[in-house]
Curated annotation (Swiss-Prot):
Record Pfam families: HTH_18
GO molecular function: DNA-binding transcription factor activity; sequence-specific DNA binding
Alphabetized SMART domains for the sequence: HTH_ARAC
Subunit structure: Homodimer.
Keyword tags: Activator, DNA-binding, Plasmid, Transcription, Transcription regulation
Heme listed as a keyword: no
Protein name per its UniProtKB record: HTH-type transcriptional activator CsvR
Residue ranges: DNA binding: 183-204, 230-253
Its biological purpose: Transcriptional activator of fimbrial genes in enterotoxigenic E.coli.
Source species of the chain: Escherichia coli
Length: 267
């Protein structure tokens, strides 16, 4: 992710945002512009946005009320995604999907307006965010009330597929404080470094990209928790110098950790 901070404090531009978990956004307090390749989607206030895992997007966020958070985000962990996908397959079924097929933006990023009924379901989901079973039930009900939900179901199915990149990221994220190298990853998978490199290249990525994305994404989430000092976050993601972490964060996102936190913290 590459964040560009503007002098207009209600506006932030973010490039190269990699969606590591299937994400549902509710634009409760913002207008959200999403760019995916040459395509652009504008999501006004009070809309739901479904983001497929693995997409790389750029966004422009403009708050309506400066003191509040711009949106509500639901990020589905592996367990929730798996159970949700299995249940939806039983309810709706699904014709054979080719994971290698070229799929356009309309099948990876979907939006819908939120009426009063959907808003009530969203509130229920917020109340059950720490209860997987109740959260999944509420989410299934929400999806059932969305017209033309077949693309959402297909996207959830695609997001449940595990690629080699996911396996490498999973190993790294178990201990981001470790000084990871390609050689260590090769030992974990009991293969050569060349094999690791080629398999990642076949998925259009490399070890350094995965490591940096994992560290910076975790740092951003830790900042939003507002529970740790900069020096603590730096150590937690494997960077020993706090000042170096600030420089890397600023280079990667385009804003300092403080600017990032202040924009997203809300009232």
């Amino acid at each position: 992710m590459d964040f560009k901070y503007t002098e207009e404090k209600e506006l932030i531009k973010i490039n190269n945002v990699m969606i590591h978990k299937y994400t549902i956004l509710y634009t409760s307090n913002c207008i959200l512009d999403i760019s995916f390749g040459e395509d652009k989607i504008t999501c006004f206030n009070n809309r739901l946005v479904f983001l497929e895992r693995g997409v790389n997007i750029s966004v422009r966020i403009q708050k309506q009320k400066l003191t509040e958070k711009p949106y509500v985000a639901f990020r589905l962990n592996e367990n929730v995604l798996r159970h949700l996908k299995n249940t939806l397959m039983i309810i709706y079924g699904m014709s054979k999907i080719d994971s290698c097929e070229c799929r356009g933006v309309s099948r990876k990023i979907m939006t819908t307006e939120v009426d009063k009924m959907l808003l009530n379901v969203l509130r229920e989901m917020m109340g059950h965010h720490n209860d997987d079973s109740s959260f999944i039930s509420a989410l299934i009900y929400l999806i059932s009330k969305i017209k033309c939900n077949d693309k959402i179901i297909e996207s959830l199915y695609m997001s449940s597929i595990t690629f080699f990149t996911d396996k490498v990221r999973g190993v790294i994220e178990k201990d981001l404080s470790r000084k990871w190298t390609l050689a260590i990853i090769a030992d974990v998978f009991n293969v050569s470094e060349i094999t690791i490199r080629k398999r990642l290249e076949s998925e259009d990525t490399n070890f350094n990209q995965i490591l940096m994305q994992s560290r910076m994404s975790k740092a951003a989430l830790l900042l939003l928790e507002n529970s740790y000092q900069i020096s603590q976050i730096s150590n937690m993601i494997g960077i020993s110098s706090a000042s170096y972490f600030i420089r890397i964060f600023n280079k990667h996102f385009g804003v300092t950790p403080k600017q990032f936190f202040n924009y997203f913290k809300g009232g």
